[in-house]
Amino acid sequence: MKPYLKLETHPLANPENVIKGDKYRITVLTEHLLRLEYSEDGEFIDAASQTVVNRDFPAVEFSVKDTGDELELRTKYLQLNYNKKAFSANGLSCKTTAVGISSVPAWHYGDPTQDLGGTARTLDQVNGACELEPGIMSWFGSAVLDDSKSLLMTEDGWVTPRKKGVQDLYFFGYGWNFRLALKDFYHLCGKTPMLPRFALGNWWSRYWRYSEASYMKLMEDFDKENVPFSVAVIDMDWHRVDAVSYTHLTLPTNSR
């Protein structure tokens, strides 16, 4: 893949933010955002995925209490309890104390987060309201992004399937601070993809009495402003406009 087509990624997390066991790995991305991984063979994903491209958040202040059978991880706004086994409702929970949240019970693995919805993949055949995919914001203060099934990005810019059976979750515990949740989501997943400049060629057509020199200058001016063009049409001035007939061409000759 050509270099200019590759997505810039920073998938490696700050090692100071990582807590790792034989079959689990927890990454504290921010005081509100955790990455939760479980793998039976103890192999974890460091590559970017179709969804997550940047895990390079700064170091975060947190504490870990390990009783042998259970971990208790605390940040300023989150409390995670985990029994170090395969994720289950009894073994993995997280409570948030972020903005706007005071008495909401902890989230347990598998609980619906009752989020406010995300985006719709397509509007094909939609007539009116449509069902949205899960989002990262919730009146209950937390939401979960499950990245377990997305494809992984390769170093050459292509994609490859990930190994089955590995759980890869992102817990968002932002309370009602939706602006901060969206900001960190954009860092984690990258900005909204935009069409590249080379694919945005404009079509110029204006009914105007151009001369050859003025038309060339117009194109040069657009080029100086980095405005891309695919088509430039001379419009009506390729023929005489002061007569009924359209047969008298006024294009420059090909002698040059």
Residue locations for each model-derived region?
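Core alpha/beta catalytic barrel or barrel-like domain that forms the active/cofactor pocket
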Residues: 195-204, 227-241
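Ser/Thr/Asn(+Pro)-rich, low-complexity disordered segments
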Residues: 18, 224-226, 243
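Catalytic and substrate-binding clefts that recognize carbohydrates or anionic sugar/phosphate headgroups
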Residues: 65-199, 206-207, 212-213, 219-224
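Conserved small/polar residues in nucleotide/adenosyl-binding loops
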Residues: 247-253
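A low-complexity, Ser/Thr/Gly/Pro-enriched, surface-exposed linker/loop concept
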Residues: 4, 29-68
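Short, Gly/Pro- and small/polar-rich lid/capping loops
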Residues: 2-11
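N-terminal-proximal low-complexity accessory segments that begin disordered
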Residues: 12-15, 19-25, 29-34
